[in-house]
Amino acid sequence: MERRPELTIIAGPNGAGKSRLCPFYVSAKSFDGDKLMLDLRREHPDWPDRWVSGTVVSQLEKQKAEALEQHKDFAFETNFSSDMVLHMIEDFRAAGFKISLCYFGLRNEDESVSRVIHRVQTGGHDVADDVIRFNFHEGLKNTQQHLRLFDNLTFIDGNSDYGHIVALHISKSQTHKVVDNPPLWFKEQFEELFNGL
């Protein structure tokens, strides 16, 4: 039996360690729009924001189309703060892809802001406070509302150095596990929903 290709949504708040930790959990090279935007701004400091944003979107669409056409694994990094992720899931599911979520969690928006400040101090990219707060709340709400869209779920603690797995759900094998003492963010934000799957 041929292996189904997989779309992996790498989600979580700003500063949760998505870019740093996802290579340990996702074999497909992930599309990281924030990194591409940062690279474009460095290479083309004279470009207006709309050119940079437009280039990021066109690159995402190009890589998405290539993955769909070639039936190859694709990973996409996001805060899940918009409906774009839902449209992407629809497109990949219609093409026969398995859909997985790899979620990196933090306790609250202040923790997210603090981690972005630390990231900037160590040479990483910045995100405005109001955007971080919006992404935290909208991303959390969308993730909570749409857990059932995913065939596989992996929740990872963004506060741990190496990204400890907190909970795992694999539909095909009916695997459904939560660590004995999950972090508070998982208990408060996801445990009840996760246990209802």
Show the residue positions of the predicted features.
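Glycine-rich phosphate-binding loop used to anchor ATP phosphates in small-molecule kinases
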Residues: 52-106, 139
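The conserved Walker
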Residues: 13-14
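A glycine- and Lys/Arg-enriched "phosphate-lid" helix/loop adjacent to the NTP-binding pocket
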Residues: 97-145
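Conserved lysine of the Walker
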Residues: 18
